[in-house]
């Protein structure tokens, strides 16, 4: 076999060569850190299903945002754990409610931090669903009105992005119209545009304190559907989304790849709680090298076409200076 013309190994034979020809690179600019903030508590609460993740007491949020910024993280996604739930999740659109307070604290503490406000109701409703319940399930159009109100409150508090995750038909259009009518024409929308009804969300329910009984299959997407997944994102683009998202990320890289070929908008991909937990528990068992697997998994998401990755590993990677 001495007559080989093509020898790809020539470009892999040293670390310098491998670095020179590396096609996909990761940096902290690629990452958004999701954070959980609980009101009316004094102490941090560990999320047992997500080793290393804590619920942050609201009273310590300013300190945590400073820590996050000092580590080099430039963006966070805020999730609130409310102690004031009701049938509609009305605390989420109160001007002095938890949604508003989280954005206000983050922006007042670190003005340059890009704050994305998760816009949903599952942490604010007594039933744990993502909107207003009616006899047939979640009332889509009644929920749209409330999403608009929540979005305006978050924007007024300083949120840079409204991030609707309720999976309601028409939510991007309703939010865009509400923001524009209230004078927030420059507040952007990061839409959870392709959000699957995934079993990988399991640990998140503990982290966010969800009261859900049942499932969300009537409004979140069937994991088996590829064409519908692309359609959902393209609908949100047509309604005025500034960025699109695929959630979860790891098991849906085919969707990220195809969406990248169908849109010019930035794409986010959410490495969800179950993906995080699998890596963490496998590493704790000594089955894998955590750092190497984290970087490989994040690299695969970016390689598939994601511009931003939402990951619970972001702060650890930043503080250990694994990424810069």
Curated annotation (Swiss-Prot):
The record describes the dependence of activity on pH as: Optimum pH is 8.5.
Q: Which residues bind 5-aminolevulinate 1?
A: 205, 216
Which Gene3D superfamilies has this protein been placed in?
A: Aldolase class I (3.20.20.70)
Q: Per UniProt, where does 5-aminolevulinate 2 bind?
A: 273, 312
Q: Where does Zn(2+) bind?
A: 120, 122, 130
Means of activity regulation: Allosteric enzyme. Stimulated by magnesium ions.
Q: Which family does it belong to?
A: Belongs to the ALAD family.
Q: Return the protein name.
A: Delta-aminolevulinic acid dehydratase
Instruction: Name the gene that codes for it.
Output: hemB
